[in-house]
Amino acid sequence: MEKIWLEAQSNIKKVLTPQTYNTWIKPIHFHNVSDTNLTLEVPSKFIKEWVTEKYLSIIIEAISSLTNIKYQVDFKITEKSQVEKKKVDLQATEKIENDSTRNVDFNTNLNPKYTFDSFVCGASNQFAHAASQAVANNPACNYNPLFIYGGVGLGKTHLLIAIGNQIRENNKKAKICYYSSEKFMNEMINSLRYKKMDEFRNKFRKMDILLIDDIQFMAGKEATQEEFFHTFNALYESHKQIVVTSDKFPKDIPGLEERLRSRFEWGLIADIQPPDIETKIAILKKKSDLNSITLPNDVALFLASSATSNVRELEGMLIRLGAYASLTGSEISLNMARDILKDIIVEKTKDITVEMIQKHVADHFKIKVSELKSDKRLKTFVIPRQIAIYISRELTKASYPEIGERFGGKDHSTIIHSVKKIEKQMENDLEIKNTVEKMKKELMS
């Protein structure tokens, strides 16, 4: 049966986008089968809930087409084995520490909410996520230093702190230091001012794990780079783990000294790309669950499609909607989202026109725009026409009469009928639903 599941996965891969498949279907593994009950393994509760809601029917259909049996599919969450959690080997460190080291406050200011479990992994960040987990479970072995780079608000800090939290969970005695490069610089300046540089150096160079955020802010600051260079060398030579983040690839950071740049390239460099729509939806769903916000699917799609790739801004929009719904005692809806967030995302919805939608739908179904706007009743033209009308209503501010005018002068009752027709079909026909959502994503991305 395991071979059948692998074949089913292969077939499912053909009908989903690569990002969707890699994020939601690829992590699923066969567990067992009994009569007509099939159990599959998923790595988390979140994936279980998302796959059950979005892709269960596709999975059942794919398996049924290979076996001619309609299985009852259940999902089992596979917890990480305690055996798999490698303990950080810090026993080789010196048993005798000097007094100044003993007195160092190892309060690392690691935000407990930033964990690997709370990080939503997708195709855009999969490599950085995997590298971070590898470092957290076996620091200073294969990937030292680890350099994570990507744009603002994509999750670099989340991964950086998650590494620290995981190491702390594995070994309570680990000396972990999490600093922004700006804080490192300010503390160094104060140490110089008050003649406490020995204490400053001792503090950082006796760490087991050094996590530095936004290293690009050291660029052009010679004294700070000089001090960090020697700190880096001391830790690296002592086989301590170093992780840094940046908004740019090392070679693209202006004002960064070549000797630091080359050291960052000694280890592993992992990038984080802007999330695709599927990943943004997953992030919104996870954050809404964590904040007890009921977020309808159409609103999640609207936010993910309209909003920036900056995950923090995306979360900000969600919190704004949640606060409004809570304070007014109302439920979050698509109309509410459009109204409350109009100052943020109005420009993106304005860019989409009925004409753009007509061309996109016509191209998708390989028909002419003139045929889409005509009164021809062939199914070849009717379904694309109704889909185009439905999407026009969803993605533009055009009224029913205005949409009718752009579809060959049809009256508003015909337009309303088309919208309701597609809404009903989307409830009952998964293929129609996927087609419509795919085209909406393409238009809004």
UniProtKB/Swiss-Prot annotation:
Oligomerizes as a right-handed, spiral filament on DNA at oriC. ATP binds at residues 153, 155-157. Residues 109-325 are annotated as: Domain III, AAA+ region. The lineage of its organism: Bacteria, Pseudomonadati, Thermodesulfobacteriota, Desulfuromonadia, Geobacterales. Residues 69-108 are annotated as: Domain II. Residues 326-445 are annotated as: Domain IV, binds dsDNA. One of its GO terms (cellular component) is plasma membrane. Gene3D superfamilies: 1.10.1750.10, 1.10.8.60, 3.30.300.180, P-loop containing nucleotide triphosphate hydrolases (3.40.50.300). It comes from Geotalea daltonii (strain DSM 22248 / JCM 15807 / FRC-32). GO terms for molecular function: ATP binding; ATP hydrolysis activity; DNA replication origin binding; lipid binding. It is found in: Cytoplasm. Its main location: cytoplasm. Domain I is involved in oligomerization and binding regulators, domain II is flexibile and of varying length in different bacteria, domain III forms the AAA+ region, while domain IV binds dsDNA. Keywords: ATP-binding, Cytoplasm, DNA replication, DNA-binding, Lipid-binding, Nucleotide-binding. This is Chromosomal replication initiator protein DnaA. Residues 1-69 are annotated as: Domain I, interacts with DnaA modulators. Disulfide bonds: none annotated. PROSITE patterns: DNAA. PANTHER family: CHROMOSOMAL REPLICATION INITIATOR PROTEIN DNAA.
